[in-house]
Amino acid sequence: MITKEQIFEFFEYKDGNLYWKKQLNNRGKIGQIAGAEDLRGCRIIGFQGKHYLMHRLIFLMFHGYLPKKIDHIDCNPSNSKIENLREANHAENSYNA
């Protein structure tokens, strides 16, 4: 599991996205937006053999913990600005679906 410290070491948060701050391998270049967008519009980041949803890493970066569910307040999965993310239970998260 990725840690908050690793996120700060390898990524820079800007405008709702994470950018590579330190090169991990030959795929992500420094200054480049991390990950790739899936069919729903969520960005998925590969890090040390595991895949993470960008919005979950951003939430962990700012809050220091990972809840079971994270809701995009505006229902836009590609908007991962910290002010658009909130901890939610299953019912709250489903309400926005």
Each language-model region and where it sits:
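Short, cationic Gly/His-enriched loop motifs
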Residues: 48-97
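Short helix-coil boundary/hinge micro-motifs
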Residues: 1-43, 47
